[in-house]
Amino acid sequence: MAHEHNHNTEAIGDKRLIAAIGVNTVLTLAQVVGGILSGSLSLIADALHNLSDAASLVIALIARKIGRKPPDAFKTFGYRRSETIAALINLVTLIIVGLYLIYEAIGRFFAPQPIEGWTVVVVAGIALIVDVVTALLTYTMSKNSMNIKAAFLHNVSDALASVGVIIAGTLILLYDWYWTDTVLTLMIAGYVLWQGFST
C-alpha cells in the first residue's frame, strides 16, 4: 500500500514537472517574440534565462525517472548519480547564457535603439505570473531533490528578473530611458553568472 502511495506521489510530481516545462517553453517563445518586436534586449535576456529554467526542469524530470531505476550489474551504485550530472549540465548552461547576455548588452551600448515600452511591460507581466505559477508547481518537490530545488530557485530568480524588466519598461514609457534596458540586461547576466558559479 505504501509502495502504491509512493508511486502515485511520484506520478503527480512528474506531471507537475511536465506542466512547468510546457508553460516555461511557451513563455520563452513569447518573450523572444516580444523582445524582437519591442526591441528590448532585457526581455530577450529574460527569455534566455527562462529557457535555462525550462532546461533545468527537463533535466530534473529525466533525473527523477533515471534515479528511480534500481542498481544493476553495470550501475552498481544505481542511477541516482544522474541528478549530480544533471546539476552540472544546468550549471554550464547558466554560465553560457550569462556570457552571451553580457556580449549582447555590450553591443547594445555601442548601437542603442528605441524600445516599445508597453510591449515590454505586458510581456514581462505575463512572464511574472507564469514564473510564480511554475515556482509553486515545483516548490513541494524541491524539498526532496537538489535538482528540483535548483530548478525552483531558477524560477524564483526569473520572477525577480521579470519584475526588473517591468520596471525598465515603465521607465522607458515615462522617461524614454532606453539605457535601463541595457543595464538591466547586464544585471540579469551578472546574476545568472553568479548563480552558476555559486551553485
Report each predicted region and the residues it spans:
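The first (N-terminal) embedded transmembrane alpha-helix
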Residues: 20-30
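Short, hydrophobic transmembrane alpha-helix segments
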Residues: 33-44
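Alpha-helical transmembrane segments and adjacent TM-loop junctions that form the membrane-embedded core
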Residues: 2-19, 42, 48, 56-199
